[in-house]
A protein has these predicted regions:
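Amphipathic alpha-helical interface elements
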Residues: 1-80, 139-147
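Short, mixed-charge amphipathic alpha-helical segments
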Residues: 3-7, 71-105
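Functionally constrained cores in energy, signaling, and assembly domains
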Residues: 12, 29-32, 39-41, 45, ...
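Charge-enriched, short contiguous segments at helix-coil
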Residues: 87-147
Length: 147
């Protein structure tokens, strides 16, 4: 992952490493939670880069549910997509929202006492799309610092 996204945060890597340990131990709900937290941290990195580039404040000082932060970001991000390099615009919705939402659903199902089971295949699916998500997010972040 560090070769695909050299700027990935240490915190995101820590959660991914914990997710791997959980997966190897057959703790698939815990895997989903760790991957979800990692995905959220990665998305927050994107928001922080956006804040810096466009001099906007999206992440509040006090706690606010992540979904509210993400919704606010999306409102500001959508009109700025035109500023991105052409190659990053392709399949952006599927990458930023689709993959993030897939991983988030596993986290939400697992992180609350719903009784919903996460199968090995579901956890593996999240692991399989995570590198693409990470790579694309950090390409966007890199494009912000290169302009």
């Amino acid at each position: 992952l560090k070769t695909r996204a050299s700027g990935i945060s240490g915190l995101a890597i820590e959660y991914i490493q914990e997710a791997i340990l959980c997966f190897r131990g057959g703790a698939y709900r815990a895997t989903a939670v760790m991957l979800g937290v990692s995905s959220e941290e990665i998305f927050l990195d994107l928001i922080r880069a956006f804040e810096s580039k466009y001099n906007k404040k999206i992440i509040p000082e006090k706690y606010k549910p992540f979904q509210q932060i993400k919704d606010e970001f999306n409102k500001l991000f959508d009109p700025k997509k035109v500023d991105l390099p052409q190659g990053l615009k392709n399949n952006m919705e599927q990458t930023l929202n689709g993959i993030h939402d897939l991983i988030k659903k596993g986290r939400d199902d697992s992180g609350h006492p719903t009784g919903i089971e996460i199968t090995r295949d579901e956890a593996l699916a999240s692991f399989s799309v995570l590198p693409l998500y990470i790579e694309r997010v950090y390409q966007i972040i890199d494009s912000y610092s290169n302009k």
